[in-house]
Amino acid sequence: HDSKRNGKKYLFDLPVRAESYFSSKEIRDVRWPEDVLVTSIRRGQQNVVATGKTVMQTGDVLHVLTDLGLAKTVQEELKQLEKRQIFDT
Protein backbone atom coordinates (compact mmCIF):
# COMPACT_ATOMS: atom_id res chain seq x y z
CA HIS A 1 0.00 0.00 0.00
CA ASP A 2 2.84 2.45 0.68
CA SER A 3 3.56 3.14 -2.99
CA LYS A 4 -0.08 4.15 -3.55
CA ARG A 5 -0.05 6.85 -0.87
CA ASN A 6 0.64 10.16 -2.55
CA GLY A 7 -1.00 12.60 -0.15
CA LYS A 8 -4.06 13.08 -2.36
CA LYS A 9 -7.32 12.00 -0.76
CA TYR A 10 -10.49 10.54 -2.20
CA LEU A 11 -13.91 10.99 -0.58
CA PHE A 12 -16.74 8.71 -1.65
CA ASP A 13 -20.23 7.71 -0.54
CA LEU A 14 -21.09 4.26 0.79
CA PRO A 15 -24.83 3.60 1.20
CA VAL A 16 -25.96 1.37 4.08
CA ARG A 17 -28.58 -1.04 2.76
CA ALA A 18 -31.00 -3.11 4.84
CA GLU A 19 -29.06 -6.34 4.26
CA SER A 20 -25.69 -4.66 4.72
CA TYR A 21 -23.13 -5.91 7.21
CA PHE A 22 -22.77 -2.30 8.39
CA SER A 23 -26.44 -1.81 9.35
CA SER A 24 -26.99 -1.57 13.13
CA LYS A 25 -23.24 -1.70 13.89
CA GLU A 26 -21.15 0.91 15.65
CA ILE A 27 -18.38 2.27 13.42
CA ARG A 28 -15.74 1.01 15.86
CA ASP A 29 -17.07 -2.56 15.63
CA VAL A 30 -16.21 -2.88 11.93
CA ARG A 31 -12.77 -4.03 10.81
CA TRP A 32 -12.28 -1.32 8.19
CA PRO A 33 -9.57 -1.65 5.55
CA GLU A 34 -6.33 0.14 6.33
CA ASP A 35 -6.30 3.87 5.51
CA VAL A 36 -10.07 4.33 5.72
CA LEU A 37 -11.85 7.01 7.71
CA VAL A 38 -15.63 7.44 7.95
CA THR A 39 -15.81 11.22 8.28
CA SER A 40 -19.54 11.81 8.45
CA ILE A 41 -22.90 10.24 7.69
CA ARG A 42 -25.82 11.64 5.74
CA ARG A 43 -28.91 10.51 7.64
CA GLY A 44 -32.02 11.79 5.96
CA GLN A 45 -31.61 15.56 5.64
CA GLN A 46 -28.89 15.73 8.31
CA ASN A 47 -25.14 15.29 8.25
CA VAL A 48 -23.87 13.54 11.37
CA VAL A 49 -20.23 13.69 12.47
CA ALA A 50 -19.03 10.09 12.65
CA THR A 51 -17.44 8.79 15.85
CA GLY A 52 -16.55 5.27 16.89
CA LYS A 53 -19.80 5.03 18.85
CA THR A 54 -22.00 6.13 15.94
CA VAL A 55 -24.43 3.35 15.00
CA MET A 56 -24.84 3.00 11.24
CA GLN A 57 -28.46 2.67 10.16
CA THR A 58 -30.21 1.40 7.06
CA GLY A 59 -30.56 4.34 4.68
CA ASP A 60 -27.46 6.13 5.93
CA VAL A 61 -24.83 7.25 3.44
CA LEU A 62 -21.32 7.02 4.86
CA HIS A 63 -18.78 9.59 3.69
CA VAL A 64 -15.55 7.61 3.45
CA LEU A 65 -12.08 9.13 3.07
CA THR A 66 -9.03 7.25 1.79
CA ASP A 67 -5.86 7.86 -0.21
CA LEU A 68 -6.53 8.44 -3.91
CA GLY A 69 -4.13 5.67 -4.94
CA LEU A 70 -5.97 3.16 -2.74
CA ALA A 71 -9.51 4.17 -3.70
CA LYS A 72 -10.29 1.29 -6.08
CA THR A 73 -8.86 -1.33 -3.74
CA VAL A 74 -10.65 0.12 -0.72
CA GLN A 75 -13.98 0.30 -2.57
CA GLU A 76 -13.66 -3.36 -3.59
CA GLU A 77 -12.76 -4.40 -0.03
CA LEU A 78 -15.77 -2.49 1.32
CA LYS A 79 -18.10 -4.12 -1.23
CA GLN A 80 -16.92 -7.54 -0.05
CA LEU A 81 -17.24 -6.55 3.60
CA GLU A 82 -20.73 -5.13 3.03
CA LYS A 83 -21.94 -8.51 1.75
CA ARG A 84 -20.97 -10.34 4.94
CA GLN A 85 -23.85 -11.62 7.00
CA ILE A 86 -24.28 -10.44 10.57
CA PHE A 87 -23.64 -13.96 11.94
CA ASP A 88 -20.36 -14.19 9.97
CA THR A 89 -18.20 -12.05 12.28
Report residues per predicted region:
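Cytosolic Rossmann-like ligand/nucleotide-binding regulatory domains
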Residues: 13-77
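Membrane-interfacial segments at transmembrane helix termini in multi-pass membrane proteins
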Residues: 1-10, 75, 80-88
